[in-house]
């Protein structure tokens, strides 16, 4: 069997590009290898943050999201952005599970109940999504629209719910129908530690309007809670109804839409609406059409508006189907990223996939050993390239990220210099076997070690672009405006392989 000429992808974790050289460990370190590559080889900058990787606009990238996008060859939207995007595109209003639940309630002249964590926190839910759900129910003809507000105060300031509640009171006034029907703190409605007595408080409020307190409006109910010294998170069960209004309880034939997208704190209260349940004794158990916004658990037999997106034909799976061999190699710190996350959340190896793990150094913080285990990793990487065994090699060097996180500037420069030396050896090996290589990063970090706004130490990732450099014999010219999800199609193109239909990323080679 003839020796293979591998295509390598080297991911320099946390190696972003920033024009300003102030507190920029990447620009200021001595990097003869990278300098020569950028001077002489095809290169460009690509985006690794925000909507380009499926995160909210302007949000910095991270390693999990970066590797998932690289391996998928398509933008993988996180739940928050996926749902926000569906609202903007008009798809949300046509989501089958929501349409069916609302229409069945409207037809039977029943109520549509919408519940969820009412805040702009964006961790478990977003009030913009809840707003869209209320508008959708109204547009589809629901007359009774009841909003059950779980109050936040953890992912938002402790007393910040008033603006959100006022916003929805105004919406219902504009619609001329519907109302905020109940308030309760997330401490009760969103427990995740099997404190079923707390969950029962929320369940009884929803199904019986059983509440310690009542108020005529949501804002009045909140003010009363503050007067009792209850912050948002701990607001006791409060039924909202003005004089002459009926109780807004969940009854047979009603639709219930739970607008939290994060599963861990949505599971328990949801399980209380499933027949097989032993968390507490239910005084009533209405036959409702319950819709979960996302899948809270695989064993909850309820409708799901946004089922999990399964990633078919990721880069690793596709290579395996083509009978190709591949190696994933990194230090402990980023091993999961080049394996599990790169494979779209699949733990097991694909056929033809091998993995090599190099132990990260046992130090308290990596500024104490900025080169980390790059010499050992490089030795294994060079041996793998020269072995002739692999069609593709995916390697991650963690230094720029892990040392960047320490905030120690001198150590970050040393980390970049150690990386440069390693990259030089890998480039030599690739050239020796007439292979090809792309050098890139999953997000930025070490290019900004001082926060320009505050003047304090900057230890976080950045939302800056990352380099993409080609090493090899092909006459390559890169397109501008690429992003991480374009890397897999580009690599398949460089290897002369077909690109699967699921990969919507672009080939960045002209």
Swiss-Prot record:
Disulfide bonds: none
Keyword set, alphabetical order: Glycolysis, Isomerase, Manganese, Metal-binding
Amino acids binding Mn(2+) 1: 401, 405, 461
Pathway annotation: Carbohydrate degradation; glycolysis; pyruvate from D-glyceraldehyde 3-phosphate: step 3/5
Positions with a binding annotation for Mn(2+) 2: 13, 63, 442-443
Cofactor(s) it depends on: Mn(2+)
Record carries keyword Repeat: no
GO molecular function: manganese ion binding; phosphoglycerate mutase activity
Species per Swiss-Prot/TrEMBL record: Vibrio campbellii (strain ATCC BAA-1116)
Subunit structure: Monomer.
GO terms for cellular component: cytosol
Top-level taxon of the source organism: Bacteria
Its biological purpose: Catalyzes the interconversion of 2-phosphoglycerate and 3-phosphoglycerate.
InterPro entries: Alkaline_phosphatase_core_sf, BPG-indep_PGM_N, Metalloenzyme, PGAM_B_sf, Pgm_bpd_ind
Family matches, as HAMAP family: GpmI
Residue positions binding substrate: 124, 154-155, 186, 192, 262-265, 334
Record's protein name: 2,3-bisphosphoglycerate-independent phosphoglycerate mutase
Catalytic residues in the record: 63 (phosphoserine intermediate)
EC number: 5.4.2.12
Catalytic EC class: isomerase
GO aspect biological process, one term: glycolytic process
Reaction(s) this enzyme catalyzes, per UniProt: (2R)-2-phosphoglycerate = (2R)-3-phosphoglycerate
UniProt family annotation: Belongs to the BPG-independent phosphoglycerate mutase family.
Details of cofactor binding: Binds 2 manganese ions per subunit.
């Amino acid at each position: 069997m003839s020796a293979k000429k591998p295509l390598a992808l080297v991911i320099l974790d946390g190696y972003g590009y920033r024009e300003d050289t102030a507190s920029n460990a990447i620009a200021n370190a001595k990097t003869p290898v990278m300098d020569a590559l950028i001077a002489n080889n095809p290169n460009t900058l690509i985006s690794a943050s925000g909507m380009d990787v499926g995160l909210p606009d302007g949000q910095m990238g991270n390693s999990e999201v970066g590797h998932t996008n690289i391996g998928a060859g398509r933008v993988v939207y996180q739940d928050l952005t996926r749902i926000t995007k569906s609202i903007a595109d008009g798809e949300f209003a046509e989501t089958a599970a929501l349409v069916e639940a609302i229409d069945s309630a409207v037809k039977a002249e029943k109520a549509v109940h919408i519940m969820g964590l009412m805040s702009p926190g964006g961790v478990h839910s977003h009030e913009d999504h809840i707003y869209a759900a209320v508008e959708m129910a109204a547009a589809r003809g629901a007359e009774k629209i009841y909003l059950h507000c779980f109050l936040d105060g953890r992912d938002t300031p402790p007393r910040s719910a008033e603006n959100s509640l006022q916003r929805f009171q105004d919406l219902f006034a504009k619609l001329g129908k519907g109302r905020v029907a109940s308030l309760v703190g997330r401490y009760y409605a969103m427990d995740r530690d099997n404190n079923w007595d707390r969950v029962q408080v929320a369940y009884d409020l929803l199904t019986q309007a059983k509440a310690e307190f009542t108020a005529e409006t949501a804002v009045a109910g909140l003010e009363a809670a503050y007067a009792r010294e209850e912050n948002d998170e701990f607001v006791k069960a409060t039924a909202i109804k003005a004089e002459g209004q009926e109780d807004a309880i969940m009854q047979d034939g009603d639709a219930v839409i739970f607008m939290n997208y994060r599963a861990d704190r949505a599971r328990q209260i949801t399980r209380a609406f499933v027949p097989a349940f032993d968390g507490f004794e239910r005084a009533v158990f209405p036959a409702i059409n319950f819709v979960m916004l996302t899948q809270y658990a695989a064993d909850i037999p309820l409708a799901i508006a946004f089922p999990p997106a399964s990633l078919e034909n990721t880069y690793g799976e596709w290579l395996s189907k083509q009978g190709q061999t591949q190696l994933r190699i990194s230090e402990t710190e980023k091993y999961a990223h080049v394996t599990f996350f790169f494979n779209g959340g699949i733990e097991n190896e694909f056929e033809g996939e091998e993995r090599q793990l190099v132990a990260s150094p046992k130090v308290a913080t990596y500024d104490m050993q900025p080169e980390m285990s790059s010499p050992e990793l490089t030795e294994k990487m060079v041996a793998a390239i020269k072995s002739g065994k692999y069609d593709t090699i995916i390697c991650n060097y963690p230094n720029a990220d892990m040392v960047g996180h320490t905030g120690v500037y001198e150590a970050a420069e040393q980390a970049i210099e150690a990386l440069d030396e390693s990259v030089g050896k890998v480039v030599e090996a690739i050239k020796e076997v007439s292979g090809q290589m792309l050098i890139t990063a999953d997000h930025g970090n070490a290019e900004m070690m001082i926060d320009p706004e505050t003047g304090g130490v900057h230890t976080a990732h950045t939302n800056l672009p990352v380099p993409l450099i080609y090493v090899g014999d092909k006459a390559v010219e890169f397109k501008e405006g690429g992003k991480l999800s374009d890397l897999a199609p580009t690599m398949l193109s460089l290897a002369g392989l077909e690109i699967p239909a699921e990969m919507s990323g672009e080939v960045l080679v002209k």
